[in-house]
Amino acid sequence: MNVSRPSGRQADALRPVRIERAFTCHAEGSVLVSFGNTLVVCTASVEAKVPVFLRNKGEGWITAEYGMLPRSTHTRSEREAARGKQAGRTLEIQRLIGRALRTCVDRTALGERTITLDCDVLQADGGTRTAAITGAYVALVDAVRCLEQRGQLKKSPLIGAVAAVSVGIYRGMPVLDLDYPEDSDCDTDMNVVMNDEGGFIELQGTAEQQAFRRGELDMLLALAERGTAMLFDIQREALAR
């Protein structure tokens, strides 16, 4: 597949992806994940409590918060804390991250604990939510390993891996892992969350300029499968170091 992309990448190529573990010293799990120029810090914090609706049920909870630094984009944005209200986009993304990560955890095996994934965007160049999910999974694994090292778990609650990638139709061609110039000028934009068994966890797709057809959707999903397979390899390599 050949298409002229601003980055010069092939249509089925990811941006350079790096996952640096133990990026901060306080959280049970922390990573700096980069998808090209998109940089996200993901930390996993463990608390010995659960939300009210789960009390005394013997289950844990996985949740997430997401935010962007004021100058993570081309122009400065006011902090949401200063406005006193989270934007709808922020709420949507942090709920997505939480939903995605809950699918890879046996919450009964976790016990009555909450693991919160805080995903903070240092620099945005497209794909911040997919980078956040991919990095947050690694931070979650490190948090679980920390609990195991403390002797606080009878067995690992992890039941699979999760990663996410964007795909889209840019200049008439399906492409993988859109950066900002592509994302802002594409015909179709889609975020795909998958597990390492080939299952789809969430699909978020929108026709930005013109409708897409079933055949194009199939090509986008095939690209997403290829991309997440590469991301699972990167996650495994990071966790083996």
Curated annotation (Swiss-Prot):
GO molecular function: 3'-5'-RNA exonuclease activity; tRNA binding; tRNA nucleotidyltransferase activity
Pfam families assigned to the protein according to its UniProt record, in alphabetical order: RNase_PH, RNase_PH_C
Keyword NAD: no
The protein's Enzyme Commission number: 2.7.7.56
Enzyme class (EC, first level): transferase
Taxonomy, superkingdom: Bacteria
Function: Phosphorolytic 3'-5' exoribonuclease that plays an important role in tRNA 3'-end maturation. Removes nucleotide residues following the 3'-CCA terminus of tRNAs; can also add nucleotides to the ends of RNA molecules by using nucleoside diphosphates as substrates, but this may not be physiologically important. Probably plays a role in initiation of 16S rRNA degradation (leading to ribosome degradation) during starvation.
PANTHER family: EXOSOME COMPLEX COMPONENT (PTHR11953), EXOSOME COMPLEX COMPONENT RRP41 (PTHR11953:SF0)
Protein name (database record): Ribonuclease PH
Source organism per UniProt: Xylella fastidiosa (strain Temecula1 / ATCC 700964)
Organism classification: Bacteria, Pseudomonadati, Pseudomonadota, Gammaproteobacteria, Lysobacterales
Gene designation: rph
